[in-house]
Amino acid sequence: QRRYLVSRVSLNGHIDTRGVSDLHIKTGEFGGTMVGNGIEADCEIDFKEKNLPSIVSVTAKGVIPSSMGLGDDIHDKMTLTASGRGPLPHLICEGTVTMPELHVPALDFYDVKGDIHYDDGAMTFSDVKARVYGGIVTARGDYNVDSRVYHIYLHGEGLDSRIPTKEPRFYCLVTLDGEIHCDGNVKDLVAFGSFSSGGGFYSLIPFRGITGTFHNRYRALDFYDVTIDTDFGLIHTDAFHIIDGKLHLGKIELVDKESGESMSITDARDRKGPGRVISQIREDIKEIKERVSGLTP
């Protein structure tokens, strides 16, 4: 059941219970099914007809996503603007959602804007776009006001690895595909997907690309099947985890491209084949330094 507690309500307009009424409503802070800073609405209601056909435009400002079950402890505020028509109890509306910024685990969104469609408690989001780590993320999804079940699908391109890792020595542009699902209980929220990148470098050591998958449930972020393609071999790990902000690293292997042989990085130090990684790294650094020293301003 939807419930709202509204403060500082201002209502003015023309009321005709035998004809058409025009109302303008403005409120202060509100709570209940949804929490926010204020609502402003214009409404035209035809009392002559059955089901009270209406034309409505409404703006809800400062809406807190967590109050709608959209994430845990997310307080970045959004604005919902919509207009529609139909029987007053069952309006169908079209509108937009905007947020200056949105911070969720592992992702920081800026200038969020997208389209919404509302029909009897069911809300769909489409063509949602935002800036994330120097790139662009697009999204679509659906949300039910009553059950708080939602599904979100994301695609990101051109995400700069230096920004989320806070590591200027690690650079590549990442492409991301992900999904977020919630059954109505925010503690059961699940996010998963895959990522890949083009060429980049770490501490002046170049690599051809990175691929992997991720899974996030509540405060545990897991990465699986992560592979870094380098000139001297494939660096691979089945899993590493970030739990409550702490990194837990799984076994890291080096795979020789020619033989397919794999071994731990520690074992590779004293062996031929994949073991040439150490000497190759040193040669790469030496070569890069020589090239840099030969450049003129």
Q: In which residue ranges do the predicted regions lie?
A:
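Active-site/pore-lining binding-face segments in mid-to-C-terminal subdomains
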Residues: 226-228
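Membrane-proximal interfacial segments on either side of biological membranes
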Residues: 1-224, 233-297
